[in-house]
Curated annotation (Swiss-Prot):
It comes from Phytoplasma sp. (strain STRAWB1). The gene is rpsS. This is Small ribosomal subunit protein uS19. Coiled coil: none annotated. GO terms for cellular component: ribonucleoprotein complex; ribosome. The keyword Chaperone does not apply. It comes from the Bacteria.
Length: 28
């Protein structure tokens, strides 16, 4: 549950591309 949610999806994606999302998240 919560996979459709924006926060849950973002967290799951961040875990997969933690290194890639980390750079994007820090820039944001």
């Amino acid at each position: 549950l919560g996979e459709f949610a924006p926060t849950r999806t973002y967290r799951g994606h961040d875990k997969k591309d933690n290194k890639k999302d980390n750079k994007k998240g820090q820039k944001k």
